[in-house]
C-alpha cells in the first residue's frame, strides 16, 4: 500500500488567507523552514497505478501539481485517480470536486447523507453524472475499490458549517455526518480519521493495536482560538478533540498501543505546526508525528 498526504491542514490551509497569529506568521515568512500546508486529503493505492482520493480538498489542483504519481499518464485525457471517497460534507472535503469536472470518469463514494447534500446544491451538477457515478455506502460495510477494502465508520462530530443554521440546534447530526475510514490491502490496515469530537469505547476497540492511524489534530488546546482572540468557538464546538489535556488525543491514545500515529487536519493556529515549539516536542515525545504535505508512506 502507498499513501501520499496531499494536504495536511484544516479548513483554509496554513496559513489561512487572513491569519496573522504566531503560527500563521511563521508560515507566511517561512521562518526556520516553516512549511505551508494545503487542506487535508490523502491518496491511497494498492498497486501504485490506481489511486483513491480520500476527500476532495479545495486545493485539489495545487495538490495534483505537487504529486507526479497523480499526473495524467497516457492519451489526451487521463487520471490515475479512479475513485473519491468522502468522510464528511465539510467544505474542505467536497469543494475540490468542482475542480474535477472535466468529464473524467471516476466513482464517488459517500454516505447517503453527504450525497444528499451534494444533490441539494446544483453547483455539483457540474461534476457530470455521465462520467462520475455517485455510489452510496453503508457504514461498517467494506467496499472494494481499486484493490483496496475501504470500511467507513461513524465517529462523533458535527454537521458541516454551512448546514448549522438548518440543523434545528442538533449540531451533532446523524451517524453519517462525520466518518472515519479503515483502509485494508489484505496485508496492511490503516485508519484515517481527519475529524473526531470524542474518543468512544467503540473507537478505542477499533484502533487498539493498529499499525497506522491518521487522526484529527485540529487544535492543541480546546480554547486555543478563544485565547488568541480570533474566535469564540472552542474545538468541541467545532466538532474536534484537542491534542492536549486530560480528555485530549495524546491521553486518549496512550493506552491503545498504536504503532504509528500521525496528526492531520491541523488548524492554522496550532502551535504544534512550529517544529521548534514545546508543543511539537511534547507531541513527538508522546510518539506522535505531524503530517506535512507530500509525506509518502509505503507499507
UniProtKB/Swiss-Prot annotation:
Gene Ontology terms: biological process: pyrroloquinoline quinone biosynthetic process
One protein family per Pfam: Lactamase_B_2
Keyword annotations from UniProtKB, A to Z: PQQ biosynthesis, Transport
Pathway stated in the Swiss-Prot or TrEMBL entry: Cofactor biosynthesis; pyrroloquinoline quinone biosynthesis
PANTHER family reported in the protein's UniProt record: COENZYME PQQ SYNTHESIS PROTEIN B, HYDROLASE C777.06C-RELATED-RELATED
Family, as annotated: Belongs to the PqqB family.
Annotated NCBIfam families: PQQ_syn_pqqB (TIGR02108)
Chain's role: May be involved in the transport of PQQ or its precursor to the periplasm.
Listed name of the protein: Coenzyme PQQ synthesis protein B
Gene name as annotated: pqqB
